[in-house]
From Swiss-Prot:
Basic and acidic residues bias spans: 8-20, 62-85, 107-138, 189-226, 234-268, 289-306, 366-375, 382-396, 410-424, 436-447, 607-626, 636-659
Low complexity compositional bias, start-end: 87-105, 307-317
Gene: seu-1
Superkingdom field: Eukaryota
Principal cellular location given in the protein's record: nucleus
Protein's recorded name: Protein seu-1
Compartment(s) of residence: Nucleus
Keywords assigned by UniProt, alphabetized: Nucleus
One of the GO biological process terms: locomotion
Keyword Transmembrane helix: no
Disulfide bonds: none
Annotated Gene Ontology cellular component terms: nucleus
Compositionally biased residues, Acidic residues: 322-343
Amino acid sequence: MSSIRNQNDNRRPTFRDHRTPQFSGRGGSGGGGRRLQNPAHYPQRRDMSPIRRSSAISPVRRSQDHRQRSPEVRRHRSPEKESKDAVVTSTGSSRGATSASVTSSSRRHESGERHRETHRREDKEKKPEKSTDRDADRSNNIAARIQAPVVSSSTHHHHSNRHENRKSTAVKRPAADNRPMTYSTDVSVSRHSENRRKSSSDVSRRHGDKEKRDRKREDVKKKSNGERSSSSGRRREEDHKRKSESSRKEKKDEDVKEKVVDENKVEDEAVEMQGLVEVDCCEEEETIEQAKEHGSDEPERPESHQSAHSAAVSNASHHSDSEEELDYEEDDIDVDLDGDIDVETMKMAARGDLKVDDTTDEDEINDVKDETMEEQKEDGEPEKKKPRTSENDDKDKKHHGSSSSNSHRRREDDKDRRQSSDHHKERRRSPATRQRATDHKESRRSEGTSTRVESAASAAGTEIQRIPSLLTMRIAAPPGIKKLETLYHSGSGGSSSSSSHSSEMIIVGETFSNRWCQCSCAHHLPTTSSAAAAAGSLDASPASSSSSSSNSDASVSRIPSLMSLRTPFNNSCLFLAPPPPPSSSSSSKRSHEAAARIRAPSPPRRSFGDRGNRSDEHHGGSRHMDVGPQRRRLQDHRVRDDGRRVSSFEDRKRPERGFQDSGRVSLSLKHL
């Protein structure tokens, strides 16, 4: 009985385990009665501490099993000892015939040895490369050597850990994490497991060392194997040879791979270096430079971002010269234009006004540019800046040595120019005409026929219906136009035409509300008064210049950009509609139109905290304020616990939590 009990001791305890170990009988549980024995008499099984845990005393079978032995212990066994074992196995039978001293016990020992031998061989066949590598690594890896616990007996090492860990799932001493912590995308965070521990200088040297060591071991084994010509010995030798050869091959392959990878890296770096004449410490400009060199259309963006922000909108201040732009640099705006792009179109792209279908080609874009220029001329305003054509760009490149510095200078100019108000007006006016719908030709025709103000009005009126599909939409477009942002976030006061602002907000909201935001983040607007208000705002728009301009503005960028919405939004919200305006809170909180009510209204939330103090949120809803908190609480209990009441899903959904959750024990006790 006791042996069985010992095997299972480290599993769940019985109630008897809590008695003091002195009084537990020999077959009993506590320490098995063994605690008071002096462990010095049993050196082969000695434990680290004099208090002997029954879990450390394991059945004999397990102590002899080589698989539980820690690699350190196995490493310290000398080759002579191993050869001795082998000799016993091979020649035992013949010796048994001659000498009478071979008792049954020794024979049993031999059979055990033989058994273990086969085990070991199978194991090696299963994982040939692993075992040697692990040993060698153990000896190499200094950190592991320092951290490894001193092992007196392998069984104790194995079990005591198990014993202490029984309740926790966590590993006791996790390996030190060697991976480089980096936020940059280009460096892969988890490197290949083989390269992790090696510094590049050490790699080859260590490989060499390992091979030398392997050779030495083989020599020793050959010497010791000289005497024995047994089949098992031969087999083991062959296994070993095969193993070492395979490991060597693997090492060679790894080396080759590493070399190839390194060469690729070097080439990449060289390519990066080639285009750069003068670098202004901004990574953006490097990417622009490369783009101009290789004629790629992708990384043209960053420069345009910086120039496109107006001072109020840009996320990084202007003084940090676009070093830390937010993370929409990679792949958000997908405008494909071939060759050089002039600054104007790049700005349009950054603002999100320029919609390019996959089919459009250069001349269409040029047409649109020409239209905008003509309209500016008709306006009678001296045109401030011509859209930059590729020839101009080339001239610039010839005049000023490096185009990276050139782009820098251009950006500075833009900054200076941006500060002036007339530039604001011009910028505000032009986008409405530049707006390009997916039904490209129709919109262009309508724009061509109408005059300027009419086009603005039509843009506000007709294009509201066009809600972009996910494909055309750019969720993380760079920051939008300044006016639009103030439009979303303007308070009640602060601007002269606040009324027109609110009406415009409703227009924009109406765009999104009908099938826009699927999540509960309150970014869709209740569209109660929106139609009338929209009509009113359209009529009233010519009244004041600011309102008209901002009106066209609102129609220009349908989709507010992520960055221009400074409000917190929850991440489940894919489509960001503008948040409801603070001014129009007169309408009811929850509108019950089909558009606004996307999911069924949830039951009112009850807080976990001090339930007693809340007057409005309790089950009754229309309960009188004057009823004391004690009575209300009692009623609460009665309602909840009444057996005859049909339990609905909502009751089961949020069970009443215990007092320790509320954190205000004294309060809740007072109320009881």
